[in-house]
Amino acid sequence: MTAATHTKAQVLAAALPWLKQLHGKIVVVKYGGNAMTDDTLKAAFAADMVFLRNCGVHPVVVHGGGLQISAMLKRLGIPGDFRGGFRVTTPEVLDVARMVLFGQVGRELVGLINAHGPYAVGITGEDAHLFTAVRRDVVVDGVATDIGLVGDVEHVNTEAVRDLIAAGRIPVVSTIAPDANGVVHNINADTAAAALAAALSAEKLLMLTDIEGLYTDWPDRNSLVSQINTDELTELLPTLEAGMVPKIEACLRAVTEGVPSAHVIDGRVEHCVLVELFTDEGTGTKVVNP
């Protein structure tokens, strides 16, 4: 036996306690950031999802697509804007977001996963009443600000997702959803992932980002925290960069609504999901109740 082979065996053996803990459990993964634009990282993420599925864990993927939406808006000559970390969504922007999220980003991820076998099924928040949206405003510099057709999740109907899980599939969810009157909204993928994780009674919520985790005093690299509770995080929230706010709000929502832990991890690292779930050290920042 070579040293490399022995090392691989040791890695697998070390993962056993975590495999036992997560067997049969649902893990919701919010897929976004650089992990969606680098071909190597995309392939690694898809392989991670298939690995989880074949280890008896039930992954549910909720994906973003902000970079791809911005690129398409630019290509079409449609202006785009962000306020409070959320995209301002006019009806014209919504049409583009709907097309890109399900027709481009979602289909690509489904294809990458299904290169390993017939596992992934793509759905949107519109399918089987998965999400019911309610229009939201955001607070910018202390002022409530209208950001257009942007929704929060008012209700989650998990039946379709649970049916897919029971059939051995990996749901891949695009976050477009109607409100109670049928008006379609764009839901921030972080927000949707948190709501879905809570509704599914998931064991964990993983949030892929483009940084190593949560910094309490950015840009001080020494302020990276490995674990933080919801009380501490609530106090920290007003000091965070706008782009991090939806992610941290999502972690808070998931954990306060019953998900045992939420994890902010670095999606720029290959197999970051497996490192977080199946090693003692993990990666990034873990959010728990006090």
Swiss-Prot record:
The organism's place on the tree of life at top rank: Bacteria
Record: residues binding substrate: G65, G66, R87, N186
Stated name of the protein: Acetylglutamate kinase
Single Gene Ontology BP annotation: arginine biosynthetic process via ornithine
Similarity section: Belongs to the acetylglutamate kinase family. ArgB subfamily.
Example of a GO MF term: ATP binding
Residues in the signal sequence: none
One of the record's GO cellular component terms: cytoplasm
Organism of derivation: Mycobacterium sp. (strain KMS)
